[in-house]
Curated annotation (Swiss-Prot):
Positions of the UniProt region annotated as Tail: 278-432
Region (Linker 12): 112-128
GO BP annotations listed: heterochromatin formation; nuclear envelope organization; nuclear migration; nuclear pore localization; protein localization to nuclear envelope
Organism encoding this protein: Onchocerca volvulus
GO molecular function: structural constituent of cytoskeleton
InterPro entries per record: IF_conserved (IPR018039), IF_rod_dom (IPR039008), Lamin_tail_dom (IPR001322), Lamin_tail_dom_sf (IPR036415)
Protein name: Muscle cell intermediate filament protein OV71
Gene: OV71
Keywords: Coiled coil, Intermediate filament
Key word Coiled coil present: yes
Intrachain S-S bonds: none
Length: 432
């Protein structure tokens, strides 16, 4: 039955290990997915940052082109004002020319009048020819000046209008391209922000799942440790019960042998075959263990046939995971053990008191910050009896022996002075 239960606990332990390993693999997969998502999110964030920089650059270009367009419009307005000014100048020049023409006509009229008063035909013909020549020269010069001014004005205005139209067309094209590019980047930025929101949602969901799995893993670990502790406690209890039964059986067998030996002795005494020379020594040890989990007792009976009998009993108890497993009767060492499988026990500044026959008392104090590992033992040697090898072996430099006696009490106290474990040895001698 014990073997079946042990197999059942082992099976549960293996299943718990497999479940623990499966949870570990799931967590590793989730961590890989989380890393990939974080990398993708970082990539999208960099792309969004680049697009935002591109949008900012295009906005700057657009602002530059708008400023250039405003400058062109201002130049157009200025050129329009200049055109009006030049037209006014042309009008002024035309008026001056007209005024000069009227003045010249008046001078011509005066000259004609003077010529009319001149009765000489030759003089009249001469002045007439001179006047006609002067009029032709003035008209030719006037026509030439008007044509030159008109041609220059038309060429200049055509050139300016063409430049303004070309610049306006180019700016309109660039502004349209910039608007299309901004629209495209806005659409792309909106898509990337949507993807980023989806990925952040998935990331949050995966983090939540990973947190739940971590909680579940912690619960499984606690359940697993509790199951292990229960199994260890049951196994320890079963072993103690088996040991108690074995000790009881051994004690019965030893009692039977003792009775058989006493019967044989009495039979020989009745037959008159007593022979006290060369007595044989009969040594029997009976070990009996009591208590469910904390208290243990051991008895040793030493019989000297026909003379003396020596009886030694040991009693152990512990209030916690640290117990006194052994205290040598010759005073060489004391052995402590941490019976827990996974919990460390800080026993720094704890004290071991050993009282010999109710008189002499020996006290050993553990070093500060000393920790007894799970399932480990520590042996404290008296001076000169063992080797100093922490944390498994310590040496009590103050005494070369923990003392020897018939009634020896070894008690472990914590820093608060509370008793945590004890080991009691009692010896008695009888004469037969």
């Amino acid at each position: 039955k014990l073997i079946d239960e042990l197999e059942e606990y082992k099976k549960r332990y293996d299943e718990a290990l497999k479940a623990h390993q499966a949870d570990r693999e799931v967590i590793d997969d989730l961590l890989v997915k989380l890393s990939n998502l974080e990398a993708e999110i970082n990539l999208l964030r960099r792309r969004v940052s680049n697009l935002e920089e591109e949008v900012s650059r295009i906005k700057k270009d657009n602002l530059y082109f708008v400023n250039e367009l405003n400058k062109a419009r201002a130049n157009l307005d200025q050129e329009t004002l200049n055109r009006i000014d030049f037209q006014n100048q042309v009008q002024t020049l035309l008026e001056e020319i007209d005024f000069m023409r009227r003045v010249h006509d008046q001078e011509i009229s005066e000259l004609q009048a003077m010529a009319a008063r001149d009765t000489t035909s030759e003089n009249r013909e001469y002045f007439k020819n001179e006047l006609s020549s002067a009029i032709r020269d003035i008209r030719a010069e006037y026509d030439q000046i008007c044509n030159m001014n008109r041609t220059d004005m038309e060429s200049w205005y055509k050139l300016k209008v063409q430049e303004i139209q070309t610049q306006s067309t180019r700016q309109n094209l660039e502004q349209g391209y910039a608007k299309e590019e901004v629209k495209r980047l806005r659409v792309q930025l909106s898509d990337l922000r949507g993807k980023l929101a989806d990925l952040e949602g998935r990331n949050s969901l995966l983090e939540k799942q990973m947190q739940e799995l971590n909680y579940q893993l912690e619960d499984d670990q606690r359940s697993y440790e509790a199951a292990l502790n229960d199994r260890d406690a049951q196994i320890r209890k079963m072993r103690e019960e088996c040991q108690a039964l074995m000790m009881e059986l051994q004690m019965l067998l030893d009692t039977k042998q003792t009775l058989d030996a006493e019967i044989a002795i009495y039979r020989k005494m009745l037959e008159g075959e007593e022979n006290r020379a060369g007595l044989r020594q009969l040594v029997e040890q009976v070990v009996k263990t009591h208590g469910l989990s904390e208290i243990g007792e051991t008895e040793s009976i030493r019989v000297l046939k026909g003379e003396t009998a020596s009886r030694t009993s040991f009693q152990r108890s512990a209030k916690g995971n640290v117990s006194i497993q052994d205290a040598s009767s010759d005073g060489k060492f004391i052995l402590l053990e941490n019976t827990h499988r996974s919990k460390e026990e800080p026993i720094g500044e704890w004290r071991l008191k050993r009282k010999i026959d109710g008189k002499r008392e020996i006290v050993y104090t553990f070093p500060r910050d000393f920790i007894l590992k799970p399932g480990k033992t520590v042996k404290i040697w008296a001076r000169g009896q063992g080797v100093y090898s922490p944390p498994d072996q310590l040496v009590f430099d103050a005494e070369d022996s923990f003392g020897v006696g018939s009634n020896v009490q070894t008690i472990l106290f914590n820093k608060e002075g509370e008793e945590r474990a004890s080991h009691i040895q009692r010896s008695s001698h009888t004469i037969s």
